[in-house]
């Protein structure tokens, strides 16, 4: 039987560097690599600044992911493998913000939706993963409506700003440079705009995007090729681009710091990292990345733990419902195949009988309709009781019965992407 398995690497066990080392290529490439495996029926990938997660639907369970992790050189110390039920629970908890570094944060829900749509667009998800991800998105919304799990929660972006405030004992008289005006950079700028900043510089490779964000939230847009000038002017640099390489290299920062005695705080919340870790060796430079945000999370964690317990109750309830849905799907796939094969045989035999009768009598539309209705009714009545038994078996997890019926009626494997059994 084909079910969901998942491979999860997160901030809980892995450092930023280890997560970078575990990722090879862009999302489309990874989806393509996974889906090209004949044992994988469906697949989806989640990749954020503090997690890499892969979900597959396969008759071989986690063994497909064990092999993939080995090929990618992923250390066993940082990866978790989940079976079907564990994968479902994890995905629901993730959508509710319970697996996030910042418990209850809202950004993860949008990320799950985006990555699901990406896999859908690539044609790598079918019925099984669509059910799981749709349920996760629904539950994430329900938990945020029925609890206060996200009250007081901060995003990675606002946590970066809070961290800067803690390290520098306030930001009121500071010059801040934000590099990157994508989703994360916009969130950083928005968090800064709520504070009384001296000046915020916004840098992006596409100047117009920086200019538009500066006009919307306040700040000064700067040309990307003048980065050195504005790093020199800044007290804090928060970098959040999607570049595949370092945006702030060691030699640039070293040049900026020549003769400078006041500290320069660099906060890197990009994935992969934007800032060369070697800059930490430069005098008066303070470097922090995702790993350093844990302290901020601890500050407001306690107030959300009561709400987290309420969320767990909702998750338990919704998990039971989605598991029941999968049970129905399991039986429905066999039933659909059974009806399809049976009616195919019925139609062929009816046509054979009509051809024989046509040798002796003229078979008109009325006679053909009578034979069609008769054979259709007989076939459906014969299948009615087996259908009931199959649905009962699925409800009570009687996989042996389901498998026996499949073998008895020689129900052939379904095509890749239908995703219930193989």
Curated annotation (Swiss-Prot):
Which Enzyme Commission number(s) are listed? 1.2.1.70
Which parts of the sequence are marked as the site Important for activity?
90
Domain of life per record: Archaea
- Spell out the reaction equation it catalyses: (S)-4-amino-5-oxopentanoate + tRNA(Glu) + NADP(+) = L-glutamyl-tRNA(Glu) + NADPH + H(+)
One Pfam match, given by its short name, reads GlutR_N
Q: Write down the species.
A: Methanococcoides burtonii (strain DSM 6242 / NBRC 107633 / OCM 468 / ACE-M)
Protein family membership: Belongs to the glutamyl-tRNA reductase family.
Q: Which residues bind NADP(+)?
A: 180-185
Matching entries from InterPro entries are given as:
4pyrrol_synth_GluRdtase (IPR000343), 4pyrrol_synth_GluRdtase_dimer (IPR015896), 4pyrrol_synth_GluRdtase_N (IPR015895), GluRdtase_CS (IPR018214), GluRdtase_dimer_dom_sf (IPR036453), GluRdtase_N_sf (IPR036343), NAD(P)-bd_dom_sf (IPR036291), Shikm_DH/Glu-tRNA_Rdtase (IPR006151)
Coiled-coil blocks: none
Q: What is known of its domains?
A: Possesses an unusual extended V-shaped dimeric structure with each monomer consisting of three distinct domains arranged along a curved 'spinal' alpha-helix. The N-terminal catalytic domain specifically recognizes the glutamate moiety of the substrate. The second domain is the NADPH-binding domain, and the third C-terminal domain is responsible for dimerization.
Task: Please provide the record's keywords in A-Z order.
Answer: NADP, Oxidoreductase, Porphyrin biosynthesis
Assembly and binders:
Homodimer.
Q: Where is the active site?
A: 49 (nucleophile)
Q: What does this protein do?
A: Catalyzes the NADPH-dependent reduction of glutamyl-tRNA(Glu) to glutamate 1-semialdehyde (GSA).
Give any GO molecular function from the UniProt entry: NADP binding
Q: What is this protein called?
A: Glutamyl-tRNA reductase
Q: Extra info from the record? A: During catalysis, the active site Cys acts as a nucleophile attacking the alpha-carbonyl group of tRNA-bound glutamate with the formation of a thioester intermediate between enzyme and glutamate, and the concomitant release of tRNA(Glu). The thioester intermediate is finally reduced by direct hydride transfer from NADPH, to form the product GSA.
Which PANTHER family does UniProt cross-reference here? GLUTAMYL-TRNA REDUCTASE (PTHR43013:SF1)
Look up the record and name the pathway of this protein. Answer: Porphyrin-containing compound metabolism; protoporphyrin-IX biosynthesis; 5-aminolevulinate from L-glutamyl-tRNA(Glu): step 1/2
GO biological process assignments = protoporphyrinogen IX biosynthetic process from glutamate
Write out the residues that bind substrate: 48-51, 100, 105-107, 111
